[in-house]
Amino acid sequence: MNKLRKFNSKYMFLILVFIICFLGFFVYLKGDMYKCKILSEDEFATLKTWTVEKDNSKVILPCGFKYTGEPIVLTKKIDKVNAFDDSQYLMVMSRYFDYTVYVDDTKVFDLTTPQNGFSKTMGTQLRLVRIGKDLNGKTIKLEIRPLLGDHIQYSVVPMMIGTRSDIVWHILKTEQSEVITAVLIIIFGFVLLLLAMIIRCSEYEDDESGKMFYLGMISVICGIYLACQFKVSHIIAPNGYLPYYFEFTSLMLISVAVSLFIRTNVEGAIKKLYTSMSCIFVLNVLVQTFLNFVLKIDYKMMLFVTHILIGLFGILTLSTMIILRKKKSIQYMLISIMFPIIGSVIDIVRLYRLSDDKTIHFFSMGLYIFVLMQVTRTIRQYLTKSRSHLKAEVYEHLAFTDGLTELNNRLSFENDIN
């Protein structure tokens, strides 16, 4: 039995890391398991026509191709047998692209026009363009321009024409697993916040309610961040800028919630250090929000600041866990936090290997495991403390109350002692 415990404490973490790395390597090798076509440079040079089909398999452009700056032109001639009305939309994606839509050389949409007073790169991952009903026999032309140079593989989704509900339903089916995960994480977070407030208002308030509250914050903020990554969020939002704003704001606030949670597990100077880090993260949110709304500076232009702060926070977190590695709560946190960290690494590999639009799949699953592990431990600790309080009440009741008459005999008890 002792050997088994020693094995669990010494090798379980390495086994978990090995399993996750194996899954990531498997995804890397299976780069062709997704339904897509990777073009050669010769095929790309002759690529000019897209067909509007129900099967919207994407096309991956060659990695390292030297883009000349001229737009990639995709055209589709509408068959005369097709009937269109005013409710028809054209779905176009702009992931790493700028684009312009024409109908018979008449411009109907152009991202060079500022949206809501902000720059053209804000909240433009996906757009539904109303194209009207007079399309029979006409040609839809989509000009796209790469924005990030030749250091990644660009993926292009064929144009999709249909009603708004048809397009939303089609996208929702392709993202259903990620949407379900994000919704569960958000609901889980609100449940934790509610439980934390109930415990805080109870007779036996302790640190476990604070841990549960910060876990709820982490779940809600991360769930919002995941939800803002979905294409369907950019369609159903009343303003396309809202998912963009919440995506960057929640990304900055994740570190605040995690810092406050770790703060409840440490003491002394390290606790003060995490308090200072939380204040710095909050200041970063306020400054970037001011620069974005007042000076109209794009969040993407300030993203490197957030990345630097997250990197410093990651170094601080790992250093804390190494210093306090003998503490059981820190060991447990080290194991649980590796799931979202390694999951995010796998998603980055998928982005550059597959140019996959689902760049948060493994991160979201790792985050879900992290929240479940931490919540399980927090609830178990709270129940243990509650049981101790209950035992103390029972013993006090037996010591100062007559078992037969239920009359308080504290005075006689003290007199006997005296």
Q: What are these language model-derived features?
A:
Residues 2-5, 221-391:
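Interfacial "cap-and-anchor" motif at the non-cytosolic start of specific transmembrane alpha-helices
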Residues 393-415:
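Conserved nucleotide-binding and Mg2+-coordinating catalytic segments in signaling enzymes
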Residues 82-103, 142-144:
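Aromatic-lined ligand-binding clefts that engage carbohydrates, nucleic acids, or primary amines
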Residues 172-202, 308-321:
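First transmembrane helix
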Residues 192-219:
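Juxtamembrane interface at the cytosolic side of transmembrane helices
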Residues 103-139, 145-156:
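Beta-strand-rich ligand-recognition modules
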Residues 159-179:
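Short, aromatic-rich amphipathic segments at membrane interfaces
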Residues 3-83:
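Extended carbohydrate-recognition surfaces in non-catalytic/accessory domains of CAZymes
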